[in-house]
């Protein structure tokens, strides 16, 4: 009876530990985390997030991005699932929300809500177009996101490994929004 109760206690402890880890990462769902690349598993990448590992699947990787073990990378947590083996954390480097969260971390005006990211169109690894709007007429939304000498946007570009980012002014008028998106080309 003693070995059975010992195993039962150990099993309950492991279950509680898995629940704590699940809860911790469930709170970070739809947010960014920094992970350390562990190894390649086929075409997928195993990433250590601290208390748990995540798998960056091939379809959530940016084409052409190559990581080596010990590289620190920022990831967007798409979903956290509870499984009998512990939490399964689905992460992405291609999700448009990754760009939004990186700007929230880099630009105080975006974080505090003065500047709002209204829309993001992303071709991961190549180009992102982001439409921004300010609820304070004294704050230039594009300028706030670009930063002095491009410092803020360059920090995000660096994290995205050179992906081009176009920041445009948002407009409720679809024709004006399209004109802004196509700039510097002229819409006739």
Model-derived regions, located:
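RNA-contacting regions in translation and RNA-metabolism proteins
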Residues: 1-188
């Amino acid at each position: 009876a003693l070995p059975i109760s010992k195993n039962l206690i150990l099993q309950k402890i492991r279950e509680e530990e898995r629940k704590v880890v699940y809860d911790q990462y469930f709170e970070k769902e739809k947010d960014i985390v920094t992970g350390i690349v562990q190894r390649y598993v086929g075409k997928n990448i195993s990433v250590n997030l601290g208390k748990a590992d995540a798998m960056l699947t091939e379809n959530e990787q940016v084409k052409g991005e190559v990581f080596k073990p010990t590289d620190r990378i920022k990831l967007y947590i798409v979903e956290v699932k509870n499984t009998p083996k512990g939490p399964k954390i689905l992460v992405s480097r291609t999700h448009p929300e990754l760009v939004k969260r990186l700007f929230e971390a880099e630009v105080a005006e975006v974080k505090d809500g003065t500047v709002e990211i209204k829309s993001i169109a992303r071709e991961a690894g190549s180009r992102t177009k982001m439409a921004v709007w300010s609820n304070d007429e004294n704050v230039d939304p594009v300028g706030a996101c670009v930063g002095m000498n491009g410092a803020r946007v360059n920090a995000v570009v660096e994290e995205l490994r050179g992906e081009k980012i176009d920041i445009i002014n948002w407009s409720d008028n679809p024709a004006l929004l399209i004109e802004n998106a196509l700039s510097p080309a002229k819409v006739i």
